[in-house]
C-alpha cells in the first residue's frame, strides 16, 4: 500500500507540473497585452503523454484525446527529426513551407496541392517555384500519423504546423504549443501566392502592408524574418539585382547570370545551420543578404526590433515562438470548402 501511495504521489506531481506548464502557455497566449511567450522546456511540451502516468500506476493505456493528440505529435516528430538529422537545411525548409502555406489564405494546406489538368495550384508561383521544399517529409509524416494514430484524423495543415514547430525544436531545444483541428482546402490560390507572400525585392512599406494584412505588426514582422537565420537562398534568386542587397554584390559567391535550374546556394546568414542572432547582426552591419532583409533597417520601429534581437537571443526565441503560434492559427478564407485530405498533394 505504501508503495502504491508513493507512486500515486509521484504521478500526481508529474501531472501538476504538466498542467502548470500548459496553464502558463494558455494564459500567456490569451492575454491581450502579452508581447512574449514563455517557452516550454522540451521535457514538458506537447509530447507529454498522460498514458505514461496511467501505465505507471497500472491502469493501462488511456484512450483520451490528450493521448490521441500526442500520438500524432510523436508520429510527425519521428519523421521530422530523421529528415533534419539527414539534412540540416530541411529544418529551415519546413519552417518556410508552413509560412508560405499560412500567408496565402490562412493555414489550409493549399500549398501542398499539385497541379492537375484542371487545376493550377500555388507551387508554380515565383515565390514557390524551384524554391519551397519539404513536400516529401510532410507526406511521410502524414502517412506515419495515419498508420500509428488511425483513430485521430489529422489534416495536412496540422502536419505542416507540427513539422515547423518540431524543426524549431530541433534547432533550439525549445518548443511552443500547437493544437490540432485545422482543415485542408479543396482548392489553392495561385493569384494569392503571387500577391500575398513577401518577396525578396519588397521594400519596407510593401512588407509592412503584407504582414499587417495578416494581423502582424512591424516587430512581429521582424522576428518572423528572423527565420532567415537558418537556410539558404538560391543563386538563381540572388543573380537578379533587385533581390540582392547591393552591399553584398561584390562578395556574392554565385556565378551570374544563373539559370532557373542552377543549384548554387548562399547562406542567408554566416551560420545557416544554426538558429542564432547572426541574421540580425548582419542587418546592423548593412550585410543582410536579400534586399528585403536589409530594408528592415529603414524605420525606427524595425531598427529597434532588429537591435533587440541582435542583443538578446532569448528575446528572439521567445518572440519568434509567439509569432509562430499566432501565424499557425491564421484561419482559411471564408467560403473555402474544407476537408481532411487522405493524401496531401490532392483533394479527396
Curated annotation (Swiss-Prot):
Regulation: induction: By wounding and cold stress. Induced by acclimation and repressed by chilling.
Entry annotated with the keyword Amino-acid biosynthesis: no
GO cellular component: extracellular region
Removed propeptide positions: 21-67
Residues given in the record as Ca(2+) 1 binding sites: 101, 104, 106, 108
Catalytic activity: 2 a phenolic donor + H2O2 = 2 a phenolic radical donor + 2 H2O
Cofactor or coenzyme needed: Ca(2+); heme b
Residues where substrate binds: 198
Protein name: Neutral peroxidase
Main EC class the enzyme belongs to: oxidoreductase
Tissues where the protein occurs: Highly expressed in suspension cultured cells. Weak expression also found in the stems of intact plants. No expression in leaf, tuberous root and non-tuberous root.
